[in-house]
């Protein structure tokens, strides 16, 4: 793979987002929790001190840009590879160029975009070269490194969390592009009204790259008015981004209204309506992974034990999206939505857990009954811990009829009332049979 270009002198054909990449920390907008004056990271960057790191954050938050800025201060070459399009061959080629740089006395930053998409063996391939100083490793990921990256790689790189840019940050990015006479639209007869700037910032959900792409598209499409200026009106934004996209506000009320409509449609067993609201969310620029997470919650809250497979379907859709990307992944989430909408419904587990939580919070902290206590030591056994515990597998039907697992003060408590729908109907029959065994058992824990 070729080196990252750090030369902005010939930018005629570069997109606005590429032209406006910050060249130093002063131009970098956002991430003040990491880059504010006096923080350790900017001090290290400005001193040219390199260390391997993982940049974790949503799209458009400046992960690639920060890597480039670091390279500028360190006077280092940058090798960039993408885990989506690169394999072992590209890794070896990048490492070889880094080795040549080291032999020539130059430093190399290896920037790996979407590093979470590399498998364990591919991630391991970087370790010896990090260890011997051939490369300074910078990985960018939108996924939680704790789950997606090897512990060996994490132990050699510091993780920095980059947050979605605020609406004010995005407005500052847009203002910077409008005022910059070298890389942006400064000095040109292009006008960005405050209301349009705010609308773009609210539309892009903290994604600076998307904001600049939107601004560039508007500048290209705007017509010259009678005064010779191109005014980027909100109506043009609506045409470009879609009316529904432009309606998302900063607080997300519109977005959460759509999510609520989707959830209620699934709960109401209305697959067609659920698909409609899902499509509305997608076309409005909503995050499909947020919908995938909501599907997982629905599978537990509204389907529950009526169809335990619902949770597996929701997890599979989420996993599919992360593996294959938006085009195919959005269809997988749609499949999960239809499955959930058509599945038998039960909130029995949800309501049971709420009731148990209420008791745990509001009632006294009753002692654990002696027969249920752990007895790992001789002293505990002498104190009676675990005595008279009935091992269910030694009982008829693997059930200790008449046994009670509650404290005596709440021995008759019941939280879970299964419905008669789906698999939960069978669960209800099983629990009714067990209750009958308890009633008929001559052995009772509490009398």
Swiss-Prot record:
Binding site for ATP: 57-64
Subunit annotation: Homotetramer. Interacts with the single-stranded DNA-binding protein (ssb).
Protein's name in the database: Replication-associated recombination protein A
One Pfam family this sequence matches: AAA
Gene3D superfamilies, alphabetized: 1.10.8.60, 1.20.272.10, DNA polymerase III clamp loader subunits, C-terminal domain (1.10.3710.10), P-loop containing nucleotide triphosphate hydrolases (3.40.50.300)
Primary role: DNA-dependent ATPase that plays important roles in cellular responses to stalled DNA replication processes.
One term of GO molecular function: single-stranded DNA helicase activity
Record note on what altering residue 156 to A does: Lack of ATPase activity
SUPFAM superfamilies in the record: P-loop containing nucleoside triphosphate hydrolases, post-AAA+ oligomerization domain-like
Phenotype seen when the gene is deleted: Mutation gives no obvious mutant phenotype, but, when combined with xer or dif mutants, leads to slower growth.
GO cellular-component term (any): replisome
The organism's place on the tree of life at top rank: Bacteria
Keywords in alphabetical order: ATP-binding, DNA replication, Nucleotide-binding
Source organism: Escherichia coli (strain K12)
Similarity-based family: Belongs to the AAA ATPase family. RarA/MGS1/WRNIP1 subfamily.
Extra remark: Overexpression causes an increase in mutation frequency and inhibits growth of recA mutant.
One example of a Gene Ontology biological process annotation: DNA synthesis involved in DNA repair
Domain notes: Contains an N-terminal ATP-binding domain, an adjacent helical lid domain, and a C-terminal tetramerization domain.
Gene that produces this protein: rarA
